Amino acid sequence: MNLLFFSSLLTALIILCIPLLLSFTPYYKLENYPHHVKTMIMWSFIISLVPMLSFLNGGVEATVTNWHWFTTQTFNLSMNFKLDLYTIMFLPIALLITWSIMEFSIWYMSSDPKINQFMKYLLIFLITMLTLISANNLFQLFIGWEGVGIMSFMLIGWWHARTDANTAALQAILYNRIGDIGFILAMAWFLIHTNSWEFQQMFLLHTNLLPLLGLILAATGKSAQFGLHPWLPFAMEGPTPVSALLHSSTMVVAGIFLLVRFSPLLEQNSTALTMALCLGAITTLFTAACALTQNDIKKIIAFSTSSQLGLMMVTIGLNQPFLAFLHICTHAFFKAMLFLCSGSIIHNLNDEQDIRKMGGLINILPITSSALIIGSLALTGMPFLAGFYSKDLIIESLNTSNTNAWALSLTLVATTFTAVYSTRVIFLALLNQPRFSPASSINENNPLLINPIKRLAIGSILAGFLLTSYINPTTLTPTTMPPFIKVTALVITILGFILALELYLTTNNLTLKPHSQLHTFSNLLGYFPLIMHRKPTAQNFFLGQNMATMLIDLTWFEKSGPKGISSHQLTILTSVTEAQKGLMKIYFLSFLITPPIIITLLLF
């Protein structure tokens, strides 16, 4: 069984590398290279099911050391792979979602002359994420961490002729640099105090708040928590397949996964858990509130990602790392599907992204619309869809834990907001009369478009049930929970639906009035980009200008530099020159002063 486990896992990873090796051959320039990449990922997914089923049957974890890297005094560094529950379960999920996105990309990017390079970048994006997931030491994890960061920069700015895409790519890399500072400082602390970067050695150490703060900062940047969140909504400026892969199973969940990996240390420090809880609660409410008034369909879905990441951070703060990982897995299915559905709509409507200019699509794009409804319902936590099995457990854990009641309240309000903006997308984009140009050529009869969406729709329906049925600790149902707590998540979700429906029916025929301050606050993202991107930039510019002109130019050149020396010399020369005017009284005065000075010097 072990031989089958390791050989199948190694085969799945090797197959992923074949398209990368082909990129150095003439085959890379052929038209069927994208299809080859898609096929390799499909076979890799099928083979990865073997170790997953083997793990579910035996439940044996393993650590594999493939290559000893180097040794410096007492510090050893090897290429280690940690094959535990998180790695084995996430691998087929990531491969299935990437397979679907790759197939969708062949249709979506068919007119792009560099589609081969685009597919290669997506594949590298996946490989770096799998490197991060399977790493057994911090250095290897850091390679995957930086890999997903640089690949997100390359892919978000894929359409580099667009200013918005370049700005979004720069935002992503700069905000993540701030988080990387925390990661590097945590690595340095662990190296100094444990002389090792392997997880097994670090987890033996008595917990300390400093490295945990660095890890939380790293997760805040990578998973777009409040304060370092503005890059995520703007990351949708890249092609839709990039958004689907980035928001579902790669970049943004890396920060949460980092904290899941370090849960043995986090659970020993209540301060770090409280920080994660409060940070996640603020993030999930703020981003859900921002999503309420957005009109760009991709931006709404992007804000929903940030809100769900906040919910995962809340789960980390509750010391429930497995529930956070479960929500990562279920969220990946319907979030990827939501982005693919939005890409189908945008592509068919000639790049129109405003939901106010859509409508009636359920009759024109029935498969896409049905999948969008399934994804929206799964996002809200509707029973028996994928999101319900993880989201309901998180709300139950919040209700039954002795934690900050404000965090619980904020999370419940954010859950209601999720139902509101999901319903708003369904009503404006899919129902009622069409509000787009009749010249749009709409057609979804393409297997490259329909098959990925169908595949992810099935996953959005069944993934939660399958994951919670066969994996501990969710297989045991708690029996001591009061009924009113058990149905809390469902009640607030239904309230959100009712609220959205009432608001839509009430305001449908009303004349437009100037927006309220709350609407403006939500629509402008809490003024956060305005404050953080303009004010500090202007202050730094003026500070740098003043330092350059006042301190450097004025002080160095004018006061103490060449001009300063010449001005001082000029003063002395002027005094000496004025003393030599040819007046007899000045000569007699100097004659009288000179002898006393000479006598004084001789005596003392």
Swiss-Prot record:
Catalysed reactions, as listed in the record: a ubiquinone + NADH + 5 H(+)(in) = a ubiquinol + NAD(+) + 4 H(+)(out)
Lipid bilayer topology: Multi-pass membrane protein
Complexes and interactors: Core subunit of respiratory chain NADH dehydrogenase (Complex I) which is composed of 45 different subunits.
Alphabetical GO biological process terms: electron transport coupled proton transport; mitochondrial electron transport, NADH to ubiquinone; mitochondrial respiratory chain complex I assembly
Lineage: Eukaryota, Metazoa, Chordata, Craniata, Vertebrata
Name of one Pfam family that matches: Proton_antipo_M
Localization terms from the record: Mitochondrion inner membrane
Family statement drawn from the similarity comment of this UniProt entry: Belongs to the complex I subunit 5 family.
Record-linked InterPro entries: NADH_DH_su5_C, NADHpl_OxRdtase_5_subgr, ND/Mrp_TM, NU5C-like, Proton_antipo_N
GO molecular function: NADH dehydrogenase (ubiquinone) activity
Purpose: Core subunit of the mitochondrial membrane respiratory chain NADH dehydrogenase (Complex I) which catalyzes electron transfer from NADH through the respiratory chain, using ubiquinone as an electron acceptor. Essential for the catalytic activity and assembly of complex I.
EC class name: translocase
A GO term from the CC aspect: respiratory chain complex I
Domain of life: Eukaryota
Native organism: Ornithorhynchus anatinus (Duckbill platypus)
Entry's transmembrane regions: 4-24, 40-60, 88-108, 115-135, 138-158, 172-192, 201-221, 240-260, 272-292, 300-319, 324-346, 359-379, 410-430, 456-476, 481-501, 584-604
EC number: 7.1.1.2
UniProt protein name: NADH-ubiquinone oxidoreductase chain 5
Keyword entries, A-Z: Electron transport, Membrane, Mitochondrion, Mitochondrion inner membrane, NAD, Respiratory chain, Translocase, Transmembrane, Transmembrane helix, Transport, Ubiquinone
